[in-house]
Amino acid sequence: MSRPRILIDGDTLKLEEILQVARNEATVELSPDAATRVRASRALVDRVAAGDTPAYGINTGFGTLAEVRIDKKDLRDLQRNLILSHACGVGTPLPLPEARALLLLRCNVLAKGYSGIRMETLALALDMLNRDVVPVVPERGSVGASGDLAPLAHLALVFIGEGEAFYQGQRMPAKQALERAGLQPVVLEAKEGLALVNGTQAMCAVGTLLQLRAESLADIADVAGAMTLEGLLGSHKPFIPEIHDVRAHPGQKDVAAHLRRILVDSELVESHVNCSKVQDPYSLRCMPQVHGAAREGIAFSRRILEVEVNSATDNPLVFADTERIVSGGNFHGQPISLAMDVVAMALTQLSSISERRVEQLVNPSLSNLPAFLAKNSGLNSGFMIAQVTSAALVAESRVLSHPASVDSIPSSAGREDHVSMGMTAALKGRQVSDFARSCLAIEILVAAQALDFRLPLKPGKGALAAYELVRSKVPHMDKDRELHRDIEAVSQLVDSGELLAAVRSATA
């Protein structure tokens, strides 16, 4: 079956399209208008390179070496040396989806026509994507200005036949990967090395996939919370529209409406209409307020990313229409750094309130259910340590929620005296999202056990769909067993989208 094709024009790339390419589920093609812009900007660079006027990155050194003039005969070596010298990354390589997203995003910014790249070089990048040649990019080494220099240098190594790449998932020398794909490396001309390494695409690649995952986890948090509410015989009244209309934060209203859909047709709520309990704990009653605030933080990040992935973040920028090549600071990753910190904090709050709901479920004095939801408690410990694991993940998430965006370490002999730490923010946000996924999986698993004790009464339609899917993969726990596998099974339902799909189908 042929893959859908995404047109790259530098202006209209969507986050969801980035995910498609990251998963190798779509091919890419350069738009004709973008090709025209690329050729026009390259023509200006060629004219400047042929002249004697100094132009940063074309016939000068880089950073604090910008005042050093480079002889015309050395311009190719200048660009090659830039790539080689900046490939200083360390750590594990970016996962393949993030590395593909990185390559795509660099193609998109080059397609805007402000970088001065040659069509031959951009065509190689597009061919690499379509033939599954993915650069090996160590994930550590960027301070987020001048953009993501080290990660992008590792990306650019493959263009010149250096470094390493994955070809169809197999790691090998870059030159071999290109040969297997029927491609040839390029010799970089004036400015091309700089055009490949200057920008925010690494933090945006990690950030885009984090963003889409965070949006999914925000929905999962509502499902988990609704299941817990039903297992604890909680009230639906805190979610009525009137309460949220008088404090009209959009995220809060959205969560309340989502919870109402998940809880519709609940048999459990009718079973305790006249109970003596007056109010539920905050972790249940305040789900719209807490989950809603997290959603709004995540929505803020989406707005930033949607602009950034379609922005020219090179330096200098080539304005072919006015025949100017101008140095600026569009490579500075501060917008992304702030956005990624907000996502991490939002996900940590979802994990934190989830862990508190798990405590409500396993604590017999709060749940009026068997201690730790175990039959024959004492002999069996039930879900005691599942709550401890959740607490550990929340604690580490809180540490990782310290903002990277307020940090800065000067570099390049003081020329680059303020940096964004955007890649740091994105990477720690990714880790926080892993923890949030696990926390919510634990809550769903524990809530399913609680719902077993409420049978034959059934929860609302959405909660029931989630419960039944979980039970199709993980049986009720009659006696102690290794819970790691159960947590992983539910985590897989979360990551695959299967759980959300089941809930959405039931509540459509």
Curated annotation (Swiss-Prot):
Pfam families: Lyase_aromatic
Keyword annotations from UniProtKB, A to Z: Cytoplasm, Histidine metabolism, Lyase
SUPFAM superfamilies: L-aspartase-like
Cross-link type 5-imidazolinone (Ala-Gly), residue numbers: A145-G147
Swiss-Prot/TrEMBL catalytic activity: L-histidine = trans-urocanate + NH4(+)
UniProt PTM comment: Contains an active site 4-methylidene-imidazol-5-one (MIO), which is formed autocatalytically by cyclization and dehydration of residues Ala-Ser-Gly.
Residues annotated with 2,3-didehydroalanine (Ser) modification: S146
EC nos: 4.3.1.3
Alphabetical GO biological process terms: L-histidine catabolic process to glutamate and formamide; L-histidine catabolic process to glutamate and formate
CDD domains cross-referenced by the UniProt entry: PAL-HAL
The keyword Cytoplasm is annotated on this UniProt entry: yes
Pathway per the UniProt entry: Amino-acid degradation; L-histidine degradation into L-glutamate; N-formimidoyl-L-glutamate from L-histidine: step 1/3
Protein name: Histidine ammonia-lyase
Subcellular location: Cytoplasm
Cellular component GO terms held in the UniProt record: cytoplasm
Location (main, coarse): cytoplasm
Molecular function terms, GO-annotated: histidine ammonia-lyase activity
Protein family: Belongs to the PAL/histidase family.
Lineage per the UniProt record: Bacteria, Pseudomonadati, Myxococcota, Myxococcia, Myxococcales
Entries under HAMAP family matching the protein: His_ammonia_lyase
